[in-house]
Amino acid sequence: MSEAIYTVTNPATGEVEETFPTATDDEVMAALERAYAARERWRKVPLEEKIAIIERVAAEYDSRQEELARIIGDEMGKPYGDATGEVWLSGDIHAYNAKHAPEVLADEELDLGERDGRAYMRKEPVGVIVGVMPWNYPYYQVARFAAPNLMLGNTILLKHAPQCP
């Protein structure tokens, strides 16, 4: 465990909301190794199961809208209306990805013009995707990164901004 910590301070009150230890190099490597180990299992999960998981995430955003909005209001000073809008949008991103995954991830036949044969474009997972998130839209930025990558079959590792870890 690192001796350095992230401190989340409510900008409106100056009060410390939470502290988190900064990950050590060894902890980061261990997290990468776990994500790498999970990638072979996750890429083989049937699309229908991935859709169900992403739909549950969308439902969590919907059912916890007030709580999640309050958290980013306290942690980063986001006005309540903006915060609830971000929570709604983040849930909607997950719902959209779940709903449209079958057609978005379907193989696409390519036009070969006058050439003989057939060619297809297939979307395949590439492995572990690392996302370094900015501070200003903590739910939205994660949703737009996580939902499509998880639907495709990639595993992800997030590094949140220090203002709202």
Give, region by region, the residue ranges found by the protein language model.
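Conserved small-residue-rich beta-alpha loop and adjacent elements
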Residues: 110-165
